[in-house]
Amino acid sequence: MQRADLRNVAIVAHVDHGKTTLVDAMLRQSGAFGAHQLLTDRVMDSMDLEREKGITILAKNTAVRHGDLTINIIDTPGHADFGGEVERGLTMVDGVLLLVDASEGPLPQTRFVLRKTLEAHLPVILVINKIDRADARPVEVVDAVYELFIDLGADESQIEFPIVYTNAREGRAALDAESVGESPDLKVLFDLLVERIPAPTYEEGHPFQALVTNLDASPYVGRLALCRIRNGRVKKGDSVAWCRHDGTIQRVRLSELYVTEALDRVDAPPEGAGPGDIIAVAGIPEIMIGDTLADADDPQPLPVITIDEPSLGMTLGVNTSPIAGRDGKKLTARLIKSRLDAELIGNVSIRVLTTDRPDTWEVQGRGELALAILVEIMRREGFELTVGKPQVITKEIGGKLHEPMERVSVDIPEDYLGVVTQLLSMRKGSMESMTNHGTGWCRMDWLVPSRGLIGFRTEFLTETRGTGQLHHVFDSYHPWLGELRTRPNGSMVSDRSGPTTGYALTNLQERGAMFLGPGIEVYEGMIVGENARSEDMDVNPTKEKKLTNMRTSSSDHTIPLVPPRQLSLEQALEFIREDECVEVTPATVRMRKVLLSAQDRGRKRGATKALV
């Protein structure tokens, strides 16, 4: 049976191709908001971090009306680091809008989200967005998408997809690229969506079944479980069977039942919700993602969602620096552990493992960005942390050590072709293909070890003067490629505590790039700059000028201080080596040696050489 009055669709794309902007336009044109309402751009991006970085981190759903139909739209992240959100989003829908930039074309993350879509056997509508760009090339982009479908092993029915061209920012859509400017609205897209995305199917008379795909919390009713109803009906106050991961089944009562209208959760109608509806239920405090809610008298669990394995890990623990506790309020191991446990409840793509230290844990995820976002969120919540260098997660396959490889796509001006090729070759990358668009820009596709990309972005942007674009996504596990040295320069390490002085920094800036200005409190073992040479250098950034009562024939020369290079959290995590870590507080991000004392570091170096 089908529910003709409902459609469930996910919007998937590479990061920053305009998914959230398109949802904004669909909400406005469906009458979801009153004409008097003032809306921010990207209303679906509700987290501060999402607005700051211009990316979607969490999968969210909204509902719009089109005539007599309700269309549930899932806005998924375009970044593979948040792939767990993409996979969960796809379990809730019957079709997909694949959004591709009219100029950039399909990129590695497009490949990632499309692969997930094809594995789920979902029909696709191709949306070529940003058609108003001066460098738009819709014909070539459509051809590239066809090639991507074939490359990913799509069958004939999947390759026969309809195409619509849009300008999401202005809310226009048309069936050919030239007509987009004349189109008044997105009606073409809405009509195509209703026509080509199948209505939810269900079995008549089948007992109630719903799979929990996400969790949320309300200050009034506690934990909310978000699920899509597969079969049957349910209403507020019903008793249902809660089928857990471990196979146990418990009878529970649904204290609240909500459905989505535009961006708001509202009480479900008195008759409840039926097959295909995306609902939020309250009344089960310990429910987890992947659990099934089923008929109390005939419980039939649904298959659990499979999530890709994490490929990167880093240690995260209590702040152990000499000046810990000055900025944050949450300092203890107990608070950090309870926060990580809370993160595990809603974030299925990370794992938390114990280490040999009781105040430190290993957090594993899909990539640097996902892990850095978690640390940034905790920092804003008042935590102080010590964060280790991100390390790849290796596997034993057939008795041999294997490491994760990433598919890398770079768009660069032709002038930087040589230097970027050299950078990626040094990191044991192998070039797969190179395309010259004839516009002075070229695109290269590489296969590079994940560990070779740690710290690569900053160097890449420096060498291309900020013009290059870099995108990468996990590909597969390959045999270990041997030793890899990624950072050629050493660190400048403070050899004592105290405030930095302009006099000391003036002398030190000749030796390398400084990370701090004058008047900043430092401690022994803290990294204050990047050495121009390959080895580490212990320095005194607190040195003051000696004053005498002797007059000299020449006055002091004024040497201007170069402004310090201030690193963000992501840049700091990329910069550090294995024997270094990042100190994170609500106010600052500092880098330091794991062993603060110069004597301890010297002893360890001596012991390492003796072993060799």
Q: Language-model features: where?
A:
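Structural and coupling elements of P-loop NTPases
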Residues: 1-612
